[in-house]
Amino acid sequence: MFTLKKSLLLLLFLGTINLSLSEQERDAKEERRDEMDVEVEKRNILNTIINLAKKILGK
């Protein structure tokens, strides 16, 4: 009986660690995705400004 309890506690502990690591990995991926979105937005704004300047200058 005691061995069964130890085994169950070990499984619970390992499952908790696995869940925690998965959450950290998911959060890291989400942060990278957010950073890439910001970079894309910056490029889009820059391209829009360049296109407007070309239209204004007539080129």
Swiss-Prot record:
The modification Leucine amide is found at L57. Residues 16-44 form a coiled coil. Has antimicrobial activity against some Gram-positive bacteria and fungi but has no activity against a range of Gram-negative bacteria except P.faecalis. Active against the Gram-positive bacteria S.aureus ATCC 25923 (MIC=4.8 uM), S.carnosus KHS (MIC=19 uM), B.licheniformis X39 (MIC=19 uM) and R.rhodochrous X15 (MIC=2.4 uM) but is inactive against E.faecium 091299 and E.faecalis 981. Has a less potent antimicrobial activity against the Gram-negative bacterium P.faecalis X29 (MIC=37.5 uM) and is inactive against E.coli, P.aeruginosa and S.typhi. Residues 1-22 form the signal peptide. It comes from the Eukaryota. Expressed by the skin glands. This is Temporin-HN2. Belongs to the frog skin active peptide (FSAP) family. Temporin subfamily. It comes from Odorrana hainanensis (Odor frog). Pfam families: FSAP_sig_propep (PF03032). The keyword Secreted applies. Residues 23-41 form a propeptide. GO terms for cellular component: extracellular region. InterPro entries: Frog_antimicrobial_propeptide. One of its GO terms (biological process) is killing of cells of another organism. It is found in: Secreted.
